[in-house]
């Protein structure tokens, strides 16, 4: 019998990997995971990977609301399968980022309370996941993503007691790569460590938030959520102020302008903002950030001398800083900063 590996796209954010044995003896069942003709369905040999569930704790603005019933059905299909041996949660299972700008993320509670409320809001989903853990037939593994990078292993364990967690280390708990048992050639991770907007940013804003590592993508997600709860049209939306590249020969200035063009493209063609950019609306109290910021604090601008500056993340835009940031995120192969900035719009 020849060992083989099959990759099948089940849904937009569901990527099951099937490690199986060729066998002509098929067992017909009603479970969709147990009727694949390429596999020997008499043994547990499939690894199912899902990600980006974005299970928020308030259905007024959570990204995943309308398809929760189908998700529960899918998870029960995994749970009752006789051929699935592992379910991997590949990041962004929780969502601490997609919260409207004027909303206190934790309300009057704590980060642990946020997890508890996320479970309550999505109780049927977590009931199935925890049943998978308790029954012990299928291994359940969790990998952090960018939208849930701020949660420690102990906090995730509140929602999923006993879940296997794949993290680079206790210090760098925001990233993780998982190699399933017996398949070292398979590497499963969320991928945010490679993304300029989403990789951890240590020492980026020490004056404002000492010890913080939340990247620029966090603030983008807050603005995006606010554009959903406070919508406007493209024509009526607040426009991004023009920023001129006055010194194109300066690599740092060029990178800052490229960063600006991404914000301009997104905020004029993807999400439409109905707020004044100088109004302090982004309440934080998350990840060692404590201030309330304006959108202008995130966007690049021309200083009095014509140079491009940013109030937050101003030191990120050199190749040297990007190299250091990649190393901090345990990236094995360095990339060019402008390629990384431009690539963020395509991921």
Predicted regions and their residues:
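Generic cytosolic/nucleocytoplasmic N-terminal low-complexity/intrinsically disordered segments
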Residues: 1-2, 21-22
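C-terminal motif of bacterial Sec signal peptides marking the signal peptidase cleavage site
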Residues: 16-19
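Sec-dependent signal peptide recognition
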Residues: 2-10
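Extended recognition/assembly regions associated with phosphoester-bond processing machinery
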Residues: 22-347
């Amino acid at each position: 019998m020849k060992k083989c590996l099959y990759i099948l796209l089940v849904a937009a954010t569901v990527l099951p990997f099937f490690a199986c044995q060729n066998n002509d003896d098929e067992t017909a069942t009603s479970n969709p995971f147990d009727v694949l003709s390429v596999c020997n369905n008499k043994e547990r040999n499939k690894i199912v990977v899902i990600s980006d569930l974005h299970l928020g704790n308030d259905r007024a603005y959570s990204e995943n609301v309308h398809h929760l019933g189908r998700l529960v059905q899918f998870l029960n299909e995994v749970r009752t399968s006789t051929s699935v041996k592992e379910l991997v949660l590949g990041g962004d299972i929780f969502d601490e980022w997609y919260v409207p700008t004027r909303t206190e993320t934790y309300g009057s509670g704590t980060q642990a309370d946020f997890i508890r409320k996320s479970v309550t809001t999505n109780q049927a989903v977590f009931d199935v996941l925890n049943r998978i853990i308790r029954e012990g037939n299928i291994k359940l593994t969790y990998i952090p993503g960018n939208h849930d990078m701020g949660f420690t292993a102990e906090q995730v364990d509140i929602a999923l007691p006993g879940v296997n967690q794949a993290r680079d280390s206790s210090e760098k708990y925001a990233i993780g790569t998982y190699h399933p048992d017996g398949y070292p050639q398979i590497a499963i991770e969320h991928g945010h460590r490679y993304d300029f907007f989403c990789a951890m940013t240590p020492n980026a804003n020490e004056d404002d938030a000492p010890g913080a590592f939340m990247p620029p993508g966090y603030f983008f997600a807050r603005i995006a959520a606010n554009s959903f709860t406070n919508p406007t049209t493209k024509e009526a939306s607040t426009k991004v102020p023009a920023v001129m590249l006055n010194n194109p020969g300066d690599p740092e200035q060029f990178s800052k302008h490229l960063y600006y063009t991404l914000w301009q493209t997104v905020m004029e063609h993807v999400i439409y903002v109905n707020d004044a950019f100088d109004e302090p609306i982004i309440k934080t109290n998350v990840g060692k950030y404590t201030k309330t910021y304006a959108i202008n604090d995130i966007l690049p601008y021309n200083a009095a001398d014509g140079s491009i500056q940013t109030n937050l993340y101003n030191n990120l835009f050199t190749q040297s800083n990007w190299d250091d940031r990649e190393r901090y995120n345990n990236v094995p192969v360095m990339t060019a900063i402008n390629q990384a900035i431009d690539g963020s719009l395509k991921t």
